[in-house]
């Protein structure tokens, strides 16, 4: 496959997904689900980077489903097909609608959580406030300098 993601690939994956919605702001938080739930295997939740949507994960979805994961991939609040949160568009504003959505969709069962870039910061904030939501956290392409005090270079 070339480095470019072709629209037909996105269309194929979108058609295979099961779509769920949970409340967010004045509308919905949209969740895309691939794969089947399996006993003893936690759902894998993928949070995309900023200015994106579930399509940030296009190249990973087939392999993760083939490996036996059930994937829950939201369009973060204010991105993709999801409504903006009422409290703004920064990572802090993502925590409440994501927590509510995860509890509505997965109940009290913990997931494994993967966050890419802005989604990594969001995942960290989510689990700092609600550590019971996930057993594992994976950060992909995090920005460690974002947490350095002003004027610090490392």
Please provide the spans of the model-predicted regions.
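Conserved catalytic-core motifs of eukaryotic protein kinase domains, centered on the activation segment
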Residues: 56-58, 82-88, 149-151
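Structural signature of beta-strand start/N-cap positions in the alpha/beta core
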Residues: 43, 70, 110-112, 133-136
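Conserved HGGG/HGGXW glycine-rich cap/lid loop of the alpha/beta-hydrolase fold
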Residues: 30-81
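Flexible "cap/lid" loop of the alpha/beta hydrolase fold
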Residues: 124, 128, 134-154
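Catalytic nucleophile serine of serine hydrolases
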Residues: 82, 117, 141
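Gly/Ala-rich beta-loop-alpha elbow adjacent to hydrolase catalytic centers
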Residues: 115, 119, 123
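Active-site loop/oxyanion-hole signature of alpha/beta-hydrolase fold enzymes
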Residues: 13-14, 18, 22-26, 32-34, ...
């Amino acid at each position: 496959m070339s480095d470019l993601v072709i629209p037909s690939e996105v269309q194929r994956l979108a058609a295979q997904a099961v779509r769920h919605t949970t409340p967010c702001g004045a509308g919905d938080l949209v969740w895309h689900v691939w794969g089947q739930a399996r006993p003893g295997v936690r759902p894998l939740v993928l949070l995309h980077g900023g200015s994106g949507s579930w399509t940030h994960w296009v190249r990973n979805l087939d392999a993760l489903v083939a490996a036996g994961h059930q994937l829950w991939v939201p369009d973060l609040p204010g991105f993709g097909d999801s409504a903006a949160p009422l409290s703004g568009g920064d990572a802090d504003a993502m925590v409440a609608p994501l927590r509510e959505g995860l509890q509505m969709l997965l109940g009290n069962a913990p997931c494994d959580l993967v966050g890419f870039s802005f989604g990594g910061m969001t995942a960290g904030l989510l689990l700092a406030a609600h550590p019971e939501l996930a057993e594992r956290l994976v950060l992909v392409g995090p920005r460690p300098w974002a947490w350095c005090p002003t004027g610090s270079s490392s």
